[in-house]
Regions:
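Soluble catalytic regions of large protease machineries
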Residues: 12, 22-28, 34-236
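Interdomain coupling/hinge region of P-loop NTPase helicase/AAA+ cores
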Residues: 1-16
Length: 236
C-alpha cells in the first residue's frame, strides 16, 4: 500500500488497458530509473516502483531522501540527471527505440541542467557566474540595462549556455546507457518482477535485482556541476 505522501506525489491510481508490448516497455522504463537509483552515488533511496498508472503517468519510480535537504551537492545533482535518463536509456538498451514516454524525464533533466549552468555557477566553461534573469526588476527601468526583464547576456553567452546544457544531458544519457548495459541482468529481473507483481517496495526491488548489498558505482563527473526536502517521483 502507498503511504499518504506517496499517494499525494504520485496521484490516484487509474484503470488503463495497455497492450502486452506497452506494459513490458513501461516495466523496463521504470526498471531503468530504479536500477540507476540503486547504483548511483548520492541518489535518493528507491522506495517503490510501480507500473500501475497514476495520474498522467503510466508508471512511477518513487524515491524519497533519507534526511531533509536544504542544499544539493554536485554528486546528488549528477545522480538526479543520470537517473532521469534511466527510462529512456532502458528502452534504448532493450528495444533499440525511443518513445514519447520519456518526455517528462527529459524535461526534468533539462531544467536541472540549465539551472546548474545559469543559476549555480557550475559550468567550467562559463565559470562562477549567475546568468539567470533576476526577479523583482520588471517595471523599474533597469530591464534595458540587463537587470531583469529578459536575458542579462548576449547571444554568444546564450549559445554557450545551450552548448553546456546539451553536453551535460548527452553525458548523462551516455552514462545511463552504459550502466544499464552493464547491469542488463538486474534490469531484466526487475522488469519481470514488475510484470508479475505490478508494484514493488524496496526489499522486493532488491530481491528482484539481486542487489541486496548495493554496489554503488564510482561517479563519472559531468565536469560542471549545486545545492529541501525533495521527493523525487520519476514518471513515465
Amino acid at each position: 500500500m502507498l503511504d499518504a505522501l506517496e499517494t499525494l506525489v504520485l496521484g490516484p491510481a487509474r484503470a488503463l488497458v495497455m497492450s502486452v508490448e506497452e506494459r513490458t516497455r513501461v516495466a523496463y522504463h521504470e526498471g531503468g530509473h530504479a536500477i540507476l537509483g540503486l547504483l548511483l552515488p548520492g541518489a535518493d533511496p528507491v522506495n517503490r516502483v510501480t507500473i500501475v498508472p497514476h495520474g498522467m503517468a503510466l508508471g512511477v519510480t518513487y524515491q524519497r531522501p533519507e534526511d531533509d535537504r536544504h542544499s544539493y551537492s554536485e554528486q546528488y545533482l549528477h545522480a538526479r540527471i543520470v537517473g532521469a535518463m534511466g527510462g529512456r536509456a532502458a528502452e534504448e538498451v532493450v528495444f533499440e527505440t525511443h518513445t514519447t514516454g520519456a518526455e517528462n524525464d527529459m524535461q526534468q533533466a533539462t531544467d536541472l541542467a540549465r539551472q546548474m549552468v545559469t543559476r549555480w555557477g557550475m559550468s567550467e566553461r562559463l565559470g562562477p557566474v549567475t546568468l539567470a534573469p533576476r526577479d523583482g526588476t520588471a517595471g523599474t527601468g533597469l530591464e534595458n540595462l540587463g537587470f531583469g526583464g529578459g536575458k542579462p547576456y548576449g547571444s554568444a553567452t546564450a549559445d554557450a549556455i545551450d552548448a553546456e546544457v546539451q553536453r551535460l544531458l548527452e553525458e548523462a544519457a551516455s552514462e545511463a546507457t552504459r550502466l544499464l548495459q552493464t547491469h542488463r541482468r538486474e534490469l531484466d529481473g526487475l522488469a519481470a518482477a514488475l510484470l508479475e507483481h505490478e508494484t514493488l517496495d524496496e526489499p522486493a526491488i532488491r530481491r528482484a535485482t539481486g542487489l541486496l548489498v548495493i554496489p554503488r558505482v564510482a561517479p563519472v563527473p559531468l565536469r560542471t556541476a549545486v545545492g529541501s526536502n525533495n521527493t523525487a517521483a520519476t514518471a513515465r
